[in-house]
Amino acid sequence: INTSMELAQWSVSYEANWLQCSKQKTAAEGTFLRITVNENTGETKRTANIKVTSTTATYTITVNQYAKGEVIVEGDIKVTPTGGKASEHQEGQDIENTYDGKFSTDGAAPFHTPWGQSAKFPVTLEYYFKGDTEIDYLIYYTRSGNGNFGKVKVYTTTNPDRSDYTLQGEYDFKEQNAPSKVSFSEGIKATGIKFEVLSGLGDFVSCDEMEFYKTNTDKTLDKQLLTVFTDITCTEIKNNVTNEQIQALPDYFVRIAEAVRDNTYDKWEKEFRIRSYEPYSNIAEWADKLMTKKYSDLDNPTGISVKAGDDIIVLVGDTYGQNISMQCIWETGTEYKQTASSGDVYMLNPGVNKLTMKGEGQLFVMYNTELTSNTAKPIKIHIPLGSGTVNGFFDLKEHKTDEKYAELLKKSTHKYFCIRGEKIMFYFHRNKLLEYVPNNILSAIHLWDNIVGWQQELMGIDDVRPSQVNNHLFAISPEGSYMWASDYQIGFVYTYLGNILLEDNVMAAEDNAWGPAHEIGHVHQAAINWASSTESSNNLFSNFI
């Protein structure tokens, strides 16, 4: 690593005993830091941090060394800004927080406009670059809460003095709590990239991280896999592929190729590891249009659970230019536990993706778009053997019967089990489902699908479903409180599930239907919610039920 500083102006320190660092200077190469590493003979990746301290700054160089046989994915090349400025910011939450590599879920502070007052739109965020590397695309990461970008203009410049910005495009990130990706028509050696944010959730502007990338067009692993498999999802073997070609793959993919070739891929594992994921509508956009609370965007469960630190391989087929990501959902709360409405998000690109899980939970595919677009097509994704644990889920449209539900529930091992109906999803404690409804779910899911449908009909919004909007309500089973409704979720305390999942119990006591319908009514009441009527106007829906 070269530097323009003299040897005496900087120092280096590290603790790992499997690498060596030396400060050197030669006539040909000038002053530089040489890093050499020993062979990794272990079975897992190892990481070391090298601290370089100078009179002007301190830098940390992270060295990752993979084990023999470990899957090495050549990702795209991250381009880090050299600086930046924003038109306004809350103290301690300036633009530097958006390119420090730290997310709010890790305890870091995001960028945020001043609290307690509306942002002075348009809010500008400007990023500086050396201009020596092409930038092909960028990813805007949101935080959970106010400030998610709505409408935004993106400008670039290649001038050394960062003048004469050129408009690259106008976008609508729809104020959603999900990453947004902007791809340029061609790579730009930008010296500056400027965002002009015209609107934001709650009249604020925030940004967790802003990442910039050069596309890596020389992905050796992708090319190697396509000598054996028919496409990058690795679900079918090409005709006339030899065993020698298969054995030449990394060990991880040898096992996959052999399972596909020999038809030994476990049927249950395969059902959830290889799936086509449907597009769903944008919840923020339709909540605004239909005057409702936000439905859930967790419409696409994978049925796969993970633990913190797991390395997960995700093979993504043609995305048709759509942006998709993976979200890991676990729990929140101190007084009592309940399912979180959002979690760590990992962007997905076509091809081989390798994700390191920050925390435990179940994985959901985030695929939200305009349903009327001709590119809103199902996307094939393969989460191969060895990546996470299959827990499964029950889908009414796909699995159809109580017998299949009972089979899937008994095979599941995670704390929570997901049931997807037409209009509502249950994400409930597995042990409570085994206690109350171990063998039958159809009566419950049909009942609550109907109740949601009746409320939508009463609102007069059933005509746009599912052609334009198709998100589900998402019911969870908190370990405290009673019943409630909010954006993204409705909650029914886990000790009460028997009263809403067993049709006889629902019909036996008025409150067993009225109470949940009252909470679902909170989701739909905005158009009739007069002042001081929050706990009564929604009863129009529960009385209708």
Question: Model segments located where?
Answer:
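Trp- and acidic/polar-enriched beta-sheet ligand-binding modules for extracellular glycan
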Residues: 121-122, 144-217
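Disordered, acidic Ser/Thr/Pro-rich linker "stalks" and the adjacent N-terminal cap
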Residues: 69-130, 143-148, 216-224
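A short beta-strand micro-motif common to beta-rich folds, especially ectodomain repeats
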Residues: 44-55
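Beta-strand-enriched, solvent-exposed domains that form extended recognition/catalytic surfaces
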Residues: 228-392
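Catalytic cores of extracellular degradative/oxidative enzymes
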Residues: 405-411, 415-545
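Extracellular beta-rich ligand/substrate-recognition surface
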Residues: 104-123, 170-176, 286-295
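Surface-exposed binding patches on compact interaction domains or structured appendages
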Residues: 3-34
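Extended extracellular/luminal ectodomain segments enriched in beta-structured repeat modules
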Residues: 120-122, 130-137, 189-190, 306-312
